Swiss-Prot record:
It comes from Petaurista elegans (Spotted giant flying squirrel). GO terms for molecular function: metal ion binding; ubiquinol-cytochrome-c reductase activity. Its cofactor is heme b. Belongs to the cytochrome b family. Heme b b566 binds at H97, H196. This is Cytochrome b. It is a multi-pass membrane protein. The gene is MT-CYB.
Length: 379
Protein backbone atom coordinates (compact mmCIF):
# COMPACT_ATOMS: atom_id res chain seq x y z
CA UNK A 1 0.00 0.00 0.00
CA UNK A 2 1.30 3.48 -0.91
CA UNK A 3 2.18 5.71 2.03
CA UNK A 4 -0.67 8.14 2.89
CA UNK A 5 1.72 11.08 3.05
CA UNK A 6 2.45 10.62 -0.67
CA UNK A 7 -1.16 10.23 -1.81
CA UNK A 8 -3.41 12.34 0.46
CA UNK A 9 -4.09 15.70 -1.31
CA UNK A 10 -3.28 17.84 1.78
CA UNK A 11 -0.56 15.76 3.43
CA UNK A 12 1.13 15.43 0.01
CA UNK A 13 1.74 19.22 -0.06
CA UNK A 14 3.34 19.10 3.42
CA UNK A 15 5.38 16.07 2.32
CA UNK A 16 6.77 17.85 -0.76
CA UNK A 17 7.53 20.98 1.27
CA UNK A 18 9.04 19.66 4.52
CA UNK A 19 9.64 15.89 4.38
CA UNK A 20 10.73 14.51 0.99
CA UNK A 21 11.98 17.90 -0.23
CA UNK A 22 15.31 17.36 -2.09
CA UNK A 23 17.82 19.63 -0.31
CA UNK A 24 21.50 20.34 -1.14
CA UNK A 25 23.62 18.30 1.28
CA UNK A 26 26.10 21.14 1.93
CA UNK A 27 23.79 23.96 3.12
CA UNK A 28 25.20 25.57 6.27
CA UNK A 29 23.61 27.01 9.43
CA UNK A 30 22.92 30.22 7.46
CA UNK A 31 20.05 28.31 5.84
CA UNK A 32 18.39 27.84 9.26
CA UNK A 33 16.88 31.32 9.32
CA UNK A 34 13.96 30.48 7.01
CA UNK A 35 12.53 28.02 9.53
CA UNK A 36 13.34 30.40 12.41
CA UNK A 37 11.40 33.18 10.67
CA UNK A 38 8.46 30.78 10.36
CA UNK A 39 8.71 30.09 14.09
CA UNK A 40 8.89 33.84 14.86
CA UNK A 41 5.77 34.44 12.77
CA UNK A 42 3.88 31.70 14.64
CA UNK A 43 5.01 33.11 18.03
CA UNK A 44 3.96 36.63 17.01
CA UNK A 45 0.53 35.56 15.71
CA UNK A 46 -0.24 33.47 18.83
CA UNK A 47 0.97 36.01 21.42
CA UNK A 48 -0.67 38.81 19.41
CA UNK A 49 -3.98 36.96 19.37
CA UNK A 50 -3.98 36.64 23.17
CA UNK A 51 -2.98 40.30 23.58
CA UNK A 52 -5.81 41.38 21.25
CA UNK A 53 -8.29 39.64 23.57
CA UNK A 54 -7.46 42.15 26.34
CA UNK A 55 -6.35 45.25 24.41
CA UNK A 56 -8.67 48.18 23.64
CA UNK A 57 -7.87 50.42 20.65
CA UNK A 58 -9.14 53.65 22.17
CA UNK A 59 -6.91 56.63 23.01
CA UNK A 60 -8.46 56.91 26.48
CA UNK A 61 -7.93 53.26 27.47
CA UNK A 62 -5.14 51.84 25.22
CA UNK A 63 -2.27 52.63 27.61
CA UNK A 64 -4.16 51.38 30.70
CA UNK A 65 -5.29 48.22 28.85
CA UNK A 66 -1.61 47.33 28.24
CA UNK A 67 -0.90 48.01 31.93
CA UNK A 68 -3.90 45.80 32.81
CA UNK A 69 -2.49 43.00 30.60
CA UNK A 70 0.85 43.16 32.44
CA UNK A 71 -0.61 43.37 35.96
CA UNK A 72 -3.93 41.53 36.04
CA UNK A 73 -4.03 39.00 33.19
CA UNK A 74 -2.63 35.52 33.94
CA UNK A 75 0.93 35.56 32.54
CA UNK A 76 -0.03 38.74 30.65
CA UNK A 77 3.43 40.23 31.30
CA UNK A 78 4.98 37.14 29.68
CA UNK A 79 2.74 37.32 26.60
CA UNK A 80 3.32 41.08 26.19
CA UNK A 81 7.12 40.86 26.48
CA UNK A 82 7.31 37.75 24.28
CA UNK A 83 5.43 39.72 21.62
CA UNK A 84 7.58 42.86 21.98
CA UNK A 85 10.92 41.01 22.06
CA UNK A 86 9.67 38.44 19.54
CA UNK A 87 9.55 41.33 17.05
CA UNK A 88 13.24 42.02 17.75
CA UNK A 89 14.14 38.36 17.22
CA UNK A 90 12.04 38.42 14.02
CA UNK A 91 14.09 41.31 12.62
CA UNK A 92 17.44 39.82 13.68
CA UNK A 93 16.52 36.63 11.77
CA UNK A 94 15.18 38.70 8.83
CA UNK A 95 18.35 40.75 8.43
CA UNK A 96 20.57 37.66 8.72
CA UNK A 97 18.34 35.87 6.17
CA UNK A 98 18.62 38.78 3.69
CA UNK A 99 22.37 39.05 4.36
CA UNK A 100 22.76 35.33 3.61
CA UNK A 101 20.85 35.85 0.34
CA UNK A 102 23.17 38.70 -0.67
CA UNK A 103 26.35 36.81 0.28
CA UNK A 104 25.52 33.54 -1.46
CA UNK A 105 23.74 35.01 -4.50
CA UNK A 106 20.27 33.68 -3.64
CA UNK A 107 18.82 36.75 -5.40
CA UNK A 108 19.39 34.99 -8.74
CA UNK A 109 16.05 33.28 -8.03
CA UNK A 110 14.46 36.67 -8.60
CA UNK A 111 10.78 35.72 -8.02
CA UNK A 112 11.62 34.26 -4.60
CA UNK A 113 13.88 37.25 -3.87
CA UNK A 114 11.33 39.90 -4.88
CA UNK A 115 8.53 38.27 -2.90
CA UNK A 116 10.97 38.21 0.02
CA UNK A 117 11.41 41.99 -0.30
CA UNK A 118 7.63 42.49 -0.43
CA UNK A 119 7.51 40.37 2.76
CA UNK A 120 10.18 42.59 4.34
CA UNK A 121 8.10 45.71 3.59
CA UNK A 122 4.92 44.06 4.94
CA UNK A 123 6.67 42.99 8.18
CA UNK A 124 8.17 46.47 8.62
CA UNK A 125 4.71 48.04 8.20
CA UNK A 126 3.25 45.56 10.70
CA UNK A 127 6.00 46.29 13.26
CA UNK A 128 5.61 50.07 12.87
CA UNK A 129 1.84 49.91 13.46
CA UNK A 130 2.32 47.55 16.40
CA UNK A 131 4.68 50.05 18.05
CA UNK A 132 1.90 52.67 17.97
CA UNK A 133 -0.63 50.50 19.85
CA UNK A 134 0.61 50.82 23.50
CA UNK A 135 -0.05 54.59 23.10
CA UNK A 136 3.00 55.72 25.03
CA UNK A 137 4.95 58.89 24.23
CA UNK A 138 7.21 57.25 21.65
CA UNK A 139 4.22 55.43 20.12
CA UNK A 140 2.36 58.70 19.56
CA UNK A 141 5.29 60.81 18.39
CA UNK A 142 6.76 58.00 16.29
CA UNK A 143 3.41 57.65 14.51
CA UNK A 144 3.18 61.44 14.04
CA UNK A 145 6.70 61.81 12.63
CA UNK A 146 6.69 58.77 10.32
CA UNK A 147 3.19 59.29 8.89
CA UNK A 148 4.02 62.99 8.41
CA UNK A 149 6.79 61.96 5.99
CA UNK A 150 4.09 61.23 3.41
CA UNK A 151 3.31 64.96 3.31
CA UNK A 152 6.54 65.29 1.29
CA UNK A 153 4.74 63.71 -1.69
CA UNK A 154 4.03 66.59 -4.09
CA UNK A 155 0.44 67.84 -4.50
CA UNK A 156 -1.40 65.01 -2.68
CA UNK A 157 0.90 64.73 0.37
CA UNK A 158 -1.08 66.73 2.95
CA UNK A 159 -4.44 65.22 1.93
CA UNK A 160 -2.89 61.73 2.05
CA UNK A 161 -1.56 62.23 5.59
CA UNK A 162 -4.92 63.53 6.84
CA UNK A 163 -6.65 60.59 5.14
CA UNK A 164 -4.32 58.12 6.92
CA UNK A 165 -4.80 59.94 10.25
CA UNK A 166 -8.58 60.09 9.84
CA UNK A 167 -8.44 63.69 11.08
CA UNK A 168 -6.03 66.59 11.51
CA UNK A 169 -3.69 64.78 13.89
CA UNK A 170 -2.84 61.28 15.15
CA UNK A 171 -5.88 60.45 17.30
CA UNK A 172 -8.54 57.82 18.07
CA UNK A 173 -9.30 57.11 14.38
CA UNK A 174 -5.58 56.54 13.68
CA UNK A 175 -5.16 54.16 16.62
CA UNK A 176 -8.27 52.14 15.70
CA UNK A 177 -7.24 51.68 12.06
CA UNK A 178 -3.62 50.87 13.02
CA UNK A 179 -4.92 48.14 15.33
CA UNK A 180 -7.11 46.74 12.53
CA UNK A 181 -4.18 46.71 10.08
CA UNK A 182 -1.76 45.34 12.68
CA UNK A 183 -4.18 42.46 13.28
CA UNK A 184 -4.76 41.56 9.60
CA UNK A 185 -1.25 42.07 8.17
CA UNK A 186 0.44 39.04 9.83
CA UNK A 187 -2.10 36.78 8.11
CA UNK A 188 -1.30 38.45 4.77
CA UNK A 189 2.39 37.90 5.61
CA UNK A 190 1.64 34.19 6.27
CA UNK A 191 -0.02 33.95 2.83
CA UNK A 192 2.97 35.66 1.19
CA UNK A 193 5.28 33.20 2.98
CA UNK A 194 3.41 30.37 1.22
CA UNK A 195 4.02 32.07 -2.15
CA UNK A 196 7.68 32.65 -1.18
CA UNK A 197 8.06 28.90 -0.45
CA UNK A 198 6.15 27.96 -3.61
CA UNK A 199 8.65 29.82 -5.80
CA UNK A 200 11.61 28.54 -3.76
CA UNK A 201 10.49 24.92 -4.25
CA UNK A 202 10.14 25.52 -8.01
CA UNK A 203 13.90 26.04 -8.26
CA UNK A 204 15.18 24.28 -5.15
CA UNK A 205 17.49 25.81 -2.54
CA UNK A 206 20.75 27.56 -3.33
CA UNK A 207 23.88 26.33 -1.50
CA UNK A 208 27.11 27.93 -0.17
CA UNK A 209 29.14 27.09 -3.30
CA UNK A 210 26.53 28.64 -5.60
CA UNK A 211 26.90 25.64 -7.92
CA UNK A 212 24.10 23.40 -9.24
CA UNK A 213 23.59 20.65 -6.66
CA UNK A 214 21.06 18.36 -8.38
CA UNK A 215 23.47 15.42 -8.23
CA UNK A 216 23.95 15.76 -4.47
CA UNK A 217 20.60 16.20 -2.74
CA UNK A 218 19.22 14.54 0.38
CA UNK A 219 15.69 14.51 1.89
CA UNK A 220 14.84 17.46 4.15
CA UNK A 221 13.58 15.11 6.89
CA UNK A 222 15.32 13.89 9.07
CA UNK A 223 18.61 15.63 8.17
CA UNK A 224 17.52 19.26 8.16
CA UNK A 225 14.59 18.97 10.57
CA UNK A 226 17.15 17.92 13.20
CA UNK A 227 19.47 20.74 12.13
CA UNK A 228 16.61 23.26 12.33
CA UNK A 229 15.72 22.10 15.86
CA UNK A 230 19.16 23.32 17.02
CA UNK A 231 18.35 26.77 15.61
CA UNK A 232 14.92 26.67 17.27
CA UNK A 233 16.57 25.90 20.64
CA UNK A 234 19.02 28.82 20.24
CA UNK A 235 16.22 31.20 19.22
CA UNK A 236 13.94 30.12 22.09
CA UNK A 237 16.80 30.37 24.60
CA UNK A 238 17.77 33.87 23.41
CA UNK A 239 14.16 35.11 23.34
CA UNK A 240 13.28 33.73 26.78
CA UNK A 241 16.53 35.04 28.31
CA UNK A 242 15.65 38.48 26.97
CA UNK A 243 12.01 38.26 28.11
CA UNK A 244 12.72 36.92 31.60
CA UNK A 245 15.87 38.86 32.52
CA UNK A 246 15.78 42.19 30.69
CA UNK A 247 12.48 42.62 28.81
CA UNK A 248 12.93 46.39 28.37
CA UNK A 249 16.51 46.24 27.10
CA UNK A 250 15.52 46.96 23.48
CA UNK A 251 12.55 49.22 24.28
CA UNK A 252 12.34 52.95 24.94
CA UNK A 253 11.73 54.28 28.50
CA UNK A 254 9.60 57.10 26.99
CA UNK A 255 6.97 54.54 26.07
CA UNK A 256 6.15 54.05 29.77
CA UNK A 257 4.76 57.60 29.78
CA UNK A 258 1.21 57.87 28.40
CA UNK A 259 0.94 59.70 25.06
CA UNK A 260 0.76 63.47 25.45
CA UNK A 261 0.30 65.59 22.29
CA UNK A 262 1.41 68.71 24.24
CA UNK A 263 4.83 67.36 25.27
CA UNK A 264 7.40 66.31 22.67
CA UNK A 265 10.12 63.83 23.80
CA UNK A 266 13.68 65.23 23.40
CA UNK A 267 14.71 62.49 20.95
CA UNK A 268 12.06 60.85 18.77
CA UNK A 269 13.33 57.55 17.39
CA UNK A 270 11.79 54.28 16.18
CA UNK A 271 12.58 50.78 17.45
CA UNK A 272 16.22 49.65 16.99
CA UNK A 273 15.47 47.58 13.87
CA UNK A 274 14.44 50.70 11.90
CA UNK A 275 17.33 52.91 13.05
CA UNK A 276 19.53 52.27 9.98
CA UNK A 277 16.74 53.47 7.64
CA UNK A 278 15.94 56.37 10.02
CA UNK A 279 19.61 57.44 9.90
CA UNK A 280 19.52 57.43 6.07
CA UNK A 281 16.29 59.50 6.19
CA UNK A 282 17.84 62.08 8.55
CA UNK A 283 21.11 62.35 6.65
CA UNK A 284 19.41 64.19 3.75
CA UNK A 285 18.43 67.79 4.62
CA UNK A 286 15.55 67.79 2.09
CA UNK A 287 12.26 66.18 3.24
CA UNK A 288 11.28 64.55 -0.07
CA UNK A 289 14.89 63.47 -0.71
CA UNK A 290 15.03 61.87 2.74
CA UNK A 291 11.78 59.97 2.18
CA UNK A 292 13.00 58.69 -1.21
CA UNK A 293 16.33 57.61 0.31
CA UNK A 294 14.42 55.82 3.10
CA UNK A 295 12.28 53.87 0.60
CA UNK A 296 15.21 53.13 -1.73
CA UNK A 297 17.38 51.87 1.16
CA UNK A 298 15.17 48.74 1.11
CA UNK A 299 13.93 48.86 -2.50
CA UNK A 300 17.57 48.83 -3.70
CA UNK A 301 17.64 45.11 -2.81
CA UNK A 302 15.37 44.47 -5.81
CA UNK A 303 18.22 45.62 -8.06
CA UNK A 304 20.60 42.92 -6.75
CA UNK A 305 19.87 40.44 -9.61
CA UNK A 306 20.47 43.22 -12.21
CA UNK A 307 23.66 44.47 -10.51
CA UNK A 308 25.18 40.97 -10.34
CA UNK A 309 28.17 41.14 -12.73
CA UNK A 310 30.23 38.22 -11.40
CA UNK A 311 30.54 34.95 -13.29
CA UNK A 312 30.24 33.15 -9.96
CA UNK A 313 26.98 33.14 -8.07
CA UNK A 314 28.24 32.96 -4.49
CA UNK A 315 30.84 35.15 -2.75
CA UNK A 316 32.42 31.99 -1.31
CA UNK A 317 35.35 32.12 -3.77
CA UNK A 318 35.48 35.94 -4.20
CA UNK A 319 37.68 37.49 -1.46
CA UNK A 320 37.35 41.10 -2.71
CA UNK A 321 33.55 40.91 -2.76
CA UNK A 322 33.65 39.31 0.70
CA UNK A 323 35.60 42.31 2.05
CA UNK A 324 33.03 44.67 0.54
CA UNK A 325 30.15 42.66 1.99
CA UNK A 326 31.56 42.93 5.51
CA UNK A 327 32.26 46.65 5.02
CA UNK A 328 28.57 46.96 4.08
CA UNK A 329 27.59 45.03 7.23
CA UNK A 330 29.78 47.32 9.39
CA UNK A 331 28.25 50.33 7.61
CA UNK A 332 24.73 49.13 8.54
CA UNK A 333 25.81 48.76 12.19
CA UNK A 334 27.17 52.32 12.04
CA UNK A 335 23.88 53.60 10.57
CA UNK A 336 21.93 51.78 13.32
CA UNK A 337 24.09 53.49 15.97
CA UNK A 338 23.74 56.92 14.31
CA UNK A 339 19.94 56.54 14.07
CA UNK A 340 19.77 56.43 17.87
CA UNK A 341 21.95 59.54 18.37
CA UNK A 342 20.78 63.18 18.50
CA UNK A 343 21.05 65.31 15.34
CA UNK A 344 24.30 67.17 16.14
CA UNK A 345 27.98 67.21 15.21
CA UNK A 346 29.75 64.74 14.65
CA UNK A 347 26.77 62.37 14.23
CA UNK A 348 25.35 64.26 11.23
CA UNK A 349 28.49 63.91 9.09
CA UNK A 350 29.05 60.28 10.18
CA UNK A 351 25.45 59.46 9.17
CA UNK A 352 25.82 61.21 5.79
CA UNK A 353 29.10 59.42 5.06
CA UNK A 354 27.65 56.03 6.07
CA UNK A 355 24.54 56.66 3.91
CA UNK A 356 26.63 57.54 0.83
CA UNK A 357 28.82 54.47 1.44
CA UNK A 358 25.73 52.21 1.75
CA UNK A 359 24.34 53.19 -1.66
CA UNK A 360 27.81 53.37 -3.29
CA UNK A 361 28.78 49.82 -2.28
CA UNK A 362 25.54 48.27 -3.58
CA UNK A 363 25.14 50.36 -6.76
CA UNK A 364 28.71 51.04 -7.90
CA UNK A 365 31.60 49.42 -5.99
CA UNK A 366 30.30 45.83 -5.70
CA UNK A 367 29.43 45.46 -9.45
CA UNK A 368 32.84 46.97 -10.40
CA UNK A 369 34.76 44.71 -8.00
CA UNK A 370 32.82 41.67 -9.31
CA UNK A 371 33.87 42.58 -12.88
CA UNK A 372 37.47 42.97 -11.69
CA UNK A 373 37.33 39.49 -10.12
CA UNK A 374 36.13 38.10 -13.47
CA UNK A 375 39.24 39.62 -15.11
CA UNK A 376 41.53 38.26 -12.38
CA UNK A 377 40.12 34.75 -12.95
CA UNK A 378 41.43 34.82 -16.53
CA UNK A 379 45.01 35.54 -15.45
Amino acid sequence: MTNIRKTHPLIKIVNHSFIDLPTPSNISAWWNFGSLLGLCLIIQILTGLFLAMHYTSDTMTAFSSVTHICRDVNYGWLIRYMHANGASMFFICLYLHVGRGLYYGSYIYFETWNIGIVLLFAIMATAFMGYVLPWGQMSFWGATVITNLLSAIPYIGTSLVEWIWGGFSVDKATLTRFFAFHFILPFIVAALVMVHLLFLHETGSNNPSGLISDSDKIPFHPYFTIKDILGVLFLTLTLMTLVLFSPDLLGDPDNYTPANPLSTPPHIKPEWYFLFAYAILRSIPNKLGGVLALVFSILILMLSPILHTSKQRSMMFRPLSQCLFWILAADLFTLTWIGGQPVEHPFIIIGQTASILYFSIILIILPLVSSLENKLLKW
